[in-house]
Amino acid sequence: MKFQLDPKIKELTKKYVAPPNAKDSFIKDIKATFESDRYSLDDDERLLHSHGQHSTDEVYKVLYNRLDSFTDLVFYVETHDEVCLLIELAKKHDVCLIPYGGGTNVTNALKPPRDEKRMVVTVDTRRMNQIEEIDKENLMVTVQSGITGKDLEGALNKEGFTVGHEPDSHEFSTVGGWISTNAAGMKKHRYGNIEDIVQNVTMVTPNGIVNQKQALTRSSIGIKAQNVMFGSEGNLGIITRATLKIHEKPEISSYESIIFK
């Protein structure tokens, strides 16, 4: 079998990004409330935050100028309080917010709707990446929602612990993303899925702050209010904090690989 290494269609180095649908009153309040490094109207930043990793179709559209919708502004939150302030301003000015973690979403949840008439702001949570507490006695860790799996696991390993949650996107995806997509991991048979690991979640919504206790186990008995944040895909609010179960790191780790010739 021979492969064509020289594609007929060349990648476009200069990607087209539609002009932002910026709402002047919202921008004015943003500038008056936050530091200038919290927000960006830059075309490259907007392009980066206007898609996830849904399929090869989405990759093709990014490479060859086929994206048909773009976020209008990217906002980088750093604290829970900043999320609260941003949501209040969005309510005041009727602005649409799209939460963004590691950018690995595969359900088109990061793509701005084509028919959305309001200004769209993508809220990047990756600066909210701190571990607030490692409770070694009760085997729990409390983190901000923007920490990646790689950084969380690395910090816990140094203390002799592990979360044990490893989705394929582990290196880039965030704890908030795990919860909002109801993620499963490669070690789920040992440590469980994300709803088995999470002990508490804090979400900021347009109507206030929700603190959700441990989710219920999986079953088919109708809608369960305790599980409403899991798999919500950013539709209900922005997750800012979570408490997860941790486990002692195994004393021995062994790895095997199979090579096909």
Each language-model region and where it sits:
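Residues at alpha-helix termini
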Residues: 32-33, 92, 158
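Alpha-helix C-terminal capping segments
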Residues: 89-92, 232
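FAD-binding subdomain of flavoenzyme oxidoreductases
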Residues: 129-261
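N-terminal flexible segment immediately upstream of the FAD-binding catalytic core
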Residues: 1-88, 106-139
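Conserved PLP cofactor-binding pocket of PLP-dependent enzymes
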Residues: 100
